[in-house]
Swiss-Prot record:
Homodimer. Homohexamer formed of two homotrimers in a head to head fashion. It holds the Pfam family PTPS. Pathway: Cofactor biosynthesis; tetrahydrobiopterin biosynthesis; tetrahydrobiopterin from 7,8-dihydroneopterin triphosphate: step 1/3. The keyword Zinc applies. Zn(2+) binds at residues 23, 48, 50. InterPro entries: 6-PTP_synth/QueD (IPR007115), 6-PTP_synth/QueD_sf (IPR038418), PTPS_Cys_AS (IPR022470), PTPS_His_AS (IPR022469). This is 6-pyruvoyl tetrahydrobiopterin synthase. The modification Phosphoserine is found at residues 18, 27. GO terms for cellular component: cytosol; mitochondrion. Its EC number is 4.2.3.12. The active site is at the interface between 2 subunits. The proton acceptor Cys is on one subunit, and the charge relay system is on the other subunit. The keyword Lyase applies. Disulfide bonds: none annotated.
């Protein structure tokens, strides 16, 4: 009998990455005047940039053999593929096809990351994606 007995314990595991990207908040559904009113300086035609931070949290049972919910090396590789390769040092609006049809708000960046990770992670493992556009502007997305 293990130290935990027959009880299968669950845990959440989080990993943080940082990436730099530029974008412009602009909706083709709005006039130029409405875009300026809604998005303010973030509607600058030349765009602007951020040093984003992303915390990805997975959850599951702690494996009784490895003692892990997920191998951190695997999580790092999933995040490299879903976040760093497509987003780091990119213009989100021009370089990431997803944002051809979606305004590149932090909310939509979080959804994009969630959807990208869902394709790579084991089913049911992804718990939440937390995107820091700045230290003060943060979006949490749980696939809802």
């Amino acid at each position: 009998m293990s130290a935990a007995g027959d009880l299968r314990r669950r845990a959440r595991l989080s990993r943080l990455v940082s990436f730099s990207a530029s974008h412009r908040l602009h909706s083709p559904s709005l006039s130029d005047e409405e875009n300026l009113r809604v998005f303010g300086k973030c509607n600058n035609p030349n765009g602007h940039g951020h040093n984003y931070k992303v915390v990805v949290t997975v959850h599951g049972e702690i494996d009784p053999v490895t003692g892990m919910v997920m191998n951190l090396t695997d999580l790092k590789e999933y995040m490299e593929e879903a976040i760093m390769k497509p987003l780091d040092h990119k213009n989100l609006d021009l370089d990431v096809p997803y944002f051809a049809d979606a305004v590149s708000t932090t909310e939509n960046v979080a959804v994009y990351i969630w959807e990208s990770l869902q394709k790579l992670l084991p089913v049911g493992a992804l718990y939440k994606v937390k995107v820091f556009e700045t230290d003060n502007n943060i979006v949490v997305y749980k696939g809802e």
